[in-house]
Amino acid sequence: MVDTKKQSFQNMLDYVHLYRLKNKLHRETADNDRKIRDNQKRVLLLDNLTQYITDAMSIEEIRAIIAHMRDDYENRVDDYMIRNAELSKQRREIRQKMAAHKQAPTVKTTD
């Protein structure tokens, strides 16, 4: 009986270890995916910039293009930050509803 409990406990510890390892690998994979995506975007940005810039352009014209692109990206960042705030608010509301469900007494029926 004692050996069975020890084995059961060990199995649970192994399961927790594997679950944490799986989550760690998932986070690392997601992080690598973000890095790949970011670098692909940088390559695309440089390609786009190369298309806009010609040999006949002055430095001022090139700076104007870069400034315009920067403004566009800053606006996108602001939009994403606003969207994240909205999503955080929704998540907070859902957590509160879930907590309320946990606090609600359960009604047991007898047959």
Swiss-Prot record:
Origin: domain of life: Bacteria
Isomerase recorded as keyword: no
Family, similarity comment: Belongs to the pole-localizer TmaR family.
Gene field: tmaR
The keyword Cytoplasm is assigned to this record: yes
Coiled coil: 70-104
UniProt-recorded name of the protein: Pole-localizer protein TmaR
A Pfam family that the UniProt record links to this protein: DUF496
Annotated keywords: Coiled coil, Cytoplasm
Cellular localisation: Cytoplasm
GO CC terms, sorted: cytosol
Biological role: Pole-localizer protein involved in the regulation of several cellular processes.
